[in-house]
Amino acid sequence: MKKKFQLEVPGGADKVLLHTCCAPCSSAIIECMMQHHITPVIYYCNPNIYPQEEYIIRKEECTRYAQSLGLEIIDADYDHENWRCHIIGMEQEPERGGRCLRCFKLRLLETARYAHEHGFSVITTTLASSRWKSLEQINEAGQYATASYADVTYWEQNWRKGGLSERRIAIIKEYNFYNQQYCGCEFSMRKEE
């Protein structure tokens, strides 16, 4: 993949804690970061994923990709029940609604906490690569998450541009990644009526 745009990491950091939702969404982002001499440390924090078997499959694919590139992957605890407690009353919200925003805030707040405790100055997320998610909500959640930690900055980056979407498709084929058909939670599995 050629460098199609310049990445400007806040503070010029060369190491970033990358909240990762799945291997397909993270693949081109990780490759792009590495080509720009940025080392991503993959943070797999996805208590929203249902069922747990799905969580494990996605985690294993992230691990396989990280290991193939010699990158560190950190697995946050899977606590789906705690996640459910945080979204009570929002179960019927549509995709891109309030439930998604609350979910993003929860996951990115945990990412920011980990970054603060382990010396990372910058976090970003692969959620910003999905055309199915609101970039505005993701950035709001990232800013919310880092507001409590003066030493951690959220890196707003539109990972849908610069040829990354096309490269993502190629990497999925190259690695034969499992490519799920829903965001992750049981509520995103609902069929459109």
Where do the model's predicted regions map?
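Nucleotide-activated chemistry modules centered on ATP-dependent adenylation/adenylyltransferase
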Residues: 1-193
